[in-house]
Amino acid sequence: MSGKSRVHIDPNCRVSYGAFYIRGLYDVFGKQRVGFSTRFFSGLKHEAPKPDYEHYMALVVAGPGSSRKRVVIDFHDSTKINEAAYDWCDVYAKTNYNKDSHPPGLYPKVVVTAPNSGYRIWGLNETRFHLYTNLLRCKLEPLSGRHRFRKDYMYQHDRRPIETYESCAQQQERSLDASPYVFFISTLWPHQNCIDVTNPYRKRFMDICRSLPIEFEGGFFGDDPTHPQYEAFRDLIIHRKYGLDGYIAKMTRSAFAFNTPAVHGCHGWKLSEYLAMGKAILSTPIMNELPAPLEHGRHVHFAQTDEGMREGVAMLLHDPAYRAHLQEGARDYYRHHASPEAAIRVILESDPFLK
């Protein structure tokens, strides 16, 4: 019913997080049928006035007559369900859902959708237009606060369109020279799960790459000497800042990408970017659900132990046929399950009214 419907988005939406899904709505419904409105959201109760909209985007799909469906897209890093938003909606799309974190059958409205990243969807004039009109719709008091609200819109514009990432799939080298190149950068996160799991995984990967006769570039951004891992990771701390265009160019050149769950075990923005770029991906095990499983040896190469990681690095460096196979698998997964359009279609297909 997408051709007959209009989509109304709550203007309190954090567009820096929601832009990926807004782009998907444009792709499915048509841009002229997607807009912002406060008309349908008076019944949406907020558990915490300001943090709420770091977590989700509320929207209403309005069909012919008075028919409508209320949808929440929860893109928070944690697996927690926002109870107030869940009670309000008909469909609760969750980016980071872990079925082991909730009793079976407790949340029947949940549908798992694709991981997102930060992408530009509007030019500067359109960004300013939506910023000021939505600020007025929020009566100058958006839930995230005016300063953050404005920063979100400009951050969205400072990103790159998803087509920039998609075009990298055609630019990648299918073969490597005698001294291959691997690029990986990360923040040295202070969250406990990152201290326990994410940061050590990333350090082991970097150490493996640095031990090989290849050109490795990257490290951890970490300017806080009080971080509990700062001393242990000191030789991997970098202070150079990479511009977004430089980052994309280096990731395109890199023989493959490395992925591991991030803050609170979330998918992280890197996964969305790598799939859009059609990268061959070496990944530690995925913690949360996906709209369809990433298959080892088809879409991604999984490794967990040091030995497995070392073997995976060697395969991706020295087996061009396998690397090309994973690149094609990543592109195929992206097209069917992880593009903005695919992320919205899996939501629509979960409810007969929305199909």
Predicted regions and their residues:
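Nucleotide-sugar donor-binding catalytic core of glycosyltransferases
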Residues: 2-268, 286-292
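Generic surface-pattern signal
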Residues: 30, 118, 145, 210, ...
